[in-house]
A protein has these predicted regions:
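Active-site helix of classical SDR
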Residues: 8, 42, 50
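Short C-terminal tail/terminal secondary-structure segment
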Residues: 31, 110, 121-136
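A conserved structural motif in NAD(P)-dependent oxidoreductases
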Residues: 94-105
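Alpha-helical segment proximal to the catalytic Tyr-Lys
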Residues: 13, 55-59, 118
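Short, flexible catalytic-loop segment of classical short-chain dehydrogenase/reductase
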Residues: 68-79, 127
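Residue(s) in the substrate-gating loop at a strand-loop-helix junction
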Residues: 26
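Active-site loop-to-helix junction immediately N-terminal to the catalytic Tyr of the SDR YXXXK motif
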Residues: 32-40, 52
Length: 136
């Protein structure tokens, strides 16, 4: 979380009012996932950083939030060592019965950049079709 902190701290100095900073985290920030220790801890720190920066930058007219998407089937997943675990997560059904896509994440980012979202401050938006609501 150090790089996003340094970048955000410095770029905020020149950002105009009504600007946005959106961090991308993951469910591994609050749930323990196999082979995800370093990333999970970093994502948890990034969510905390999001809240602290949101309070610090809100008076300057800069909104800071984070987005926490579930797994998305992309080429990046082939670099994870636990392919069977990844496959089972991707095959799980969420209440929407739909796989998450990059477009789903982009739409939330666009929403957070719009003026109508100006009172959403310091929040972590979970995008998973309700998957985290269902006990497994």
């Amino acid at each position: 979380a150090k790089a996003p902190w340094i970048l955000s701290k410095n770029i905020a100095k020149i950002m105009p009012k009504n600007s946005r900073i959106i961090n991308i985290t993951s469910p591994g920030s609050s749930k323990v996932l196999k082979n995800y220790f370093s990333v999970g801890v970093s994502k948890a720190a990034l969510e905390s950083l999001t809240r602290y920066m949101a309070v610090d930058l809100a008076p300057k007219g800069i909104n800071v939030n984070s987005i926490s998407p579930s797994l998305v089937e992309t080429d990046a997943l082939k670099y994870f060592p636990n392919q069977e675990d990844i496959k089972s997560i991707l095959e799980r059904k969420n209440p929407k019965e739909k796989k998450l896509t990059p477009d789903d994440i982009a739409e939330v980012a666009v929403l957070l950049c719009q003026e109508k979202s100006n009172m959403i401050v310091g929040q972590n938006i979970i995008i998973d079709g309700g998957e985290n609501l269902v006990l497994r």
